[in-house]
Amino acid sequence: MDPNTVSSFQVDCFLWHVRKQVADQELGDAPFLDRLRRDQKSLKGRGSTLGLNIETATCVGKQIVERILKEESDEALKMTMASAPASRYLTDMTIEEMSRDWFMLMPKQKVAGPLCVRMDQAIMDKNIILKANFSVIFDRLETLILLRAFTEEGAIVGEISPLPSLPGHTNEDVKNAIGVLIGGLEWNDNTVRVSKTLQRFAWKSSNENGRPPLTPKQKRKMARTIRSEVRRNKMAD
């Protein structure tokens, strides 16, 4: 096993412990608490994958951090903080919308890289909007916290979330997963649009109809689907 992978996990466990102490003292805001819950699931998944005990890893991570802090001067710390780019946390959804339980009559689940796509295939002929909570850096989507698909009535009919066992994903991973979700929902004649905030930071553009631009791969797949539908209609006639 790569020692850097182990030490990274150990430090992440200790830093999560510190953040949990902050939350316990009621010093964290909503985005802080949201990330804390998500990261806890991620750490459990990583610990299981690596075969490492979280409590033991937390103790070792504390030793690593203490050693680094002892060696680093205050001036070096100030320079590091000044040069580090700051990320922003953007929210389309309220805490209630993010934490609400939902159920699927005809569940479908697909893994798209490090992301899990879930949708209810029983939903038909609905107007659906995709909302997401995510962090942004350099005006680009950095990390997806959670994306959900809502009908006009407010029902949740789809979701994209990071896989705890595969931490880390790119902007392209998110766009590909959104393409999978849109394709699945539109198969049942639903009309899907993406929130303006998500369009802006994932695709750096926005369309009035709420549709993000398709990638060449998605365009080819859609063309194949249309040709298949045309052939079936001709055979039926």
UniProtKB/Swiss-Prot annotation:
Region ranges (Disordered): 205-237
Motif Nuclear export signal: chain residues: 137-146
UniProt motif Nuclear localization signal: location: 34-38
Comp. bias (Basic and acidic residues): 226-237
BP GO terms, sorted: symbiont-mediated suppression of host cytoplasmic pattern recognition receptor signaling pathway via inhibition of RIG-I activity; symbiont-mediated suppression of host gene expression; symbiont-mediated suppression of host mRNA processing; symbiont-mediated suppression of host PKR/eIFalpha signaling; symbiont-mediated suppression of host type I interferon-mediated signaling pathway
Matches recorded under InterPro entries: NS1, NS1A, NS1A_effect_dom-like_sf, uS15_NS1_RNA-bd_sf
Post-translational changes noted in the entry: Upon interferon induction, ISGylated via host HERC5; this results in the impairment of NS1 interaction with RNA targets due to its inability to form homodimers and to interact with host EIF2AK2/PKR.
Subunit field text: Homodimer. Interacts with host TRIM25 (via coiled coil); this interaction specifically inhibits TRIM25 multimerization and TRIM25-mediated RIGI CARD ubiquitination. Interacts with human EIF2AK2/PKR, CPSF4, IVNS1ABP and PABPN1.
Functional summary from the UniProt entry: Inhibits post-transcriptional processing of cellular pre-mRNA, by binding and inhibiting two cellular proteins that are required for the 3'-end processing of cellular pre-mRNAs: the 30 kDa cleavage and polyadenylation specificity factor/CPSF4 and the poly(A)-binding protein 2/PABPN1. In turn, unprocessed 3' end pre-mRNAs accumulate in the host nucleus and are no longer exported to the cytoplasm. Cellular protein synthesis is thereby shut off very early after virus infection.
Name under which the protein is recorded: Non-structural protein 1
Organism of provenance: Influenza A virus (strain A/India/6263/1980 H1N1)
Annotated gene: NS
